[in-house]
């Protein structure tokens, strides 16, 4: 939300604008976080809704109502607060209108055609939102000489009032007869500069002069402009457009590109439109990559099935895979799911899992056919024995993924579709295994009875059986040895690096540059040209887009855009030839910018995955006194500067903004017939200008502004000679007669969070550094400083962590919030399936060990522990529980094994059960191989952790579970009802 108050200081903005708006908005219960930033001349507020809100439109309507309610109570001069609820999503396409001639660019012409381009993009079918960037804004300037104006006895405000009063753009009612209605209008509306020049202005002496005789009129862009944009160092105006959600991005972008081509053909000489970004290519590439991974995984899974199960069984399971996939995709639409990167990744993850039920059913039918059962008898017997265990294993695996689906917030929205796709695939797999596999068995499996395979033996099978026999003979020793692996993994967990989400795989990066708060937009633009020139010289850089005074258009989903009306801010978007070029240039560029432009704070940032945050590491200090907050901020900034990977530190609230203060002699002011209010109005009108109506030109309305010539407005020393006009001083009075001026420091910004003042101390890191490492170092330094007295927090002040750490902790907390309830549901499912608490305990002990196996796999891969790793380990636990259920059910099906007979248990493990476990493990691992070797940092760590963790989990399945079963269940007589 933006609430401009031109000329006001941050203290005035906070007290008169930000706090009243906050008080009004805090009555809306759905608002979870409300932040405000009071800068010179503007209040910027941002709000975050509660995760429970799923339909935001009614809330935005209530916010607008609250803003409308509070607007009349705000001081005169505060522009109507505006809610910008359309900026939370990335644009689908961004185009730039650029100047192609060698002559200086014509900003007015560029902005006019940029507006036309915006209109045409808005007409593309499926367009939701458009916006222009780098728009300075056209206006008509009435430039007056203060001495000449003073001689006429007029002030800027009086002249502006005379101009606006002469505008005939008004209605004068209606003439209503019995048969007609006639609207009465006035002639003389402002439709050209010549019309303005002919306005009669009455002086204080009663004379009438033409406006053109006492002022210079010119049409141009606002000076200084509110925003400027550059494309490769040349002036440009950018237009962004976003499609309506739920459409195909490739089809919409194709329509938008056709519109751009048609518009380019209509442009006059000197103008050209250039596409600088479109989302479709990134989406198509990503979907193409994951589709290839899906196909490769499918091929590997089927190939392994043929190697491990024989061609008849493999063909049966192989036919179940596409059937399961098709059923999964068919269920997407009724469930409100879409086909995108995350849902396809979910199907890839489920590839091995979806063959699990089919393998179990196929093996069971095959064994019964070998025993001579008919197809009907074999099917009936297999369904009777396996329907409930398969349902239990499917439900427990689904429940393992359920916390991810139930997780609220941005992180849940990001990974939720992956887990949902896995769950839908598991349900589809269960249905296919019960319906399709038995239907295929008479054709593919019944013939194995006529040709029973000759038993084959080899050294690996003999070694496997020997190891299992030793395990069953010495169960306690086997359990201790097996436990060493997961326990060791959990013990080494503190040594892992932590990363919330990995960096994005993008051939783009962005640079945020901040100058001192008092910097003008002209100074920032000059710096932009230098930075652009330097960046464009780097190898692999294709395009540089610069945005001065405002944030760049969102070209990536989690970039914060809250720098409106900030002349000291520069945002650059750099396009490179490849991801490799981005990774190569970013580290060195950060150092080069710091050395070449020490007057600015330059932060080179790669795009990141997951929830957005303002800075990688952040501390928030809450309190009331600005001086105390400033001092604490500087002390904490000093601690951050000591961290080895920190490049820049910002402590926002500082008294570092120079302010020109007028020390008013109130007696002299009163003697001159002036008040403090009239003095402020005259000085403000002379420096910033005074609105004086609108010039109507075709469909364009250009604001008219009366102001002093540039020399008077840009020279502080000229301020003393400013002439004040009053009824008592006809010839005017110099400002120096009633006030003395001096420079004083003032607050550059005042930030608030949830109705409290907060000092934000933010640290930026070198490229590819892990924020968690630096945050841990900072926490240690902070605790040491608090303990030894180097840093003292006054009563009523507190410090809280922000940045990546806060987002990570919040996301993990939300993920684990529903785990307890779902664990209870899983326990109930397994207990009811086996009618035994001991068997359920075996299952969940195995699941706990799988967690440790996942940590060991992560240690082996060398990746950081992040949010997607947590998601992967939760899935791994579900798979391990599934395998354990199958083994326990197999033991229970054999009367001798249930009683603890070693040979019977060995036969169960080394027979169809081991074939099932091995096939499922290898197929799941094979299905993940394409993701393991994929490019980027998001999916390889996930796939490697799950894949290798699953291989390690077979130790639990083959050694720990049989040993514990023999100790707990078999020794008790094997009766589930008694355990």
Residue ranges and their predicted role:
Residues 12-86, 147-168, 189, 486, ...:
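Solvent-exposed, membrane-proximal periplasmic/extracellular interface segments of envelope transport
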Residues 35-42, 77-101, 131-137, 176, ...:
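Flexible hinge/switch segments at interdomain interfaces of large molecular machines
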Residues 351-365, 387-406, 413-452, 572, ...:
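Transmembrane alpha-helices and their membrane-interface boundaries in multi-pass membrane transporters
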Residues 3-9, 54, 68-77, 333, ...:
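Transmembrane helices with small-residue packing motifs
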Residues 2-4, 71, 118-296, 306, ...:
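Extracytoplasmic/periplasmic membrane-proximal domains and adjacent transmembrane bundles
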Residues 276, 283, 287, 362, ...:
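Helix-loop junctions and hydrophobic alpha-helical segments within the transmembrane domains
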Residues 384-386, 452-501, 619, 638, ...:
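Signature of alpha-helical transmembrane segments and their immediate interfacial
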Residues 299-366, 424, 826-935, 948, ...:
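Hydrophobic transmembrane alpha-helices and their membrane-interface caps
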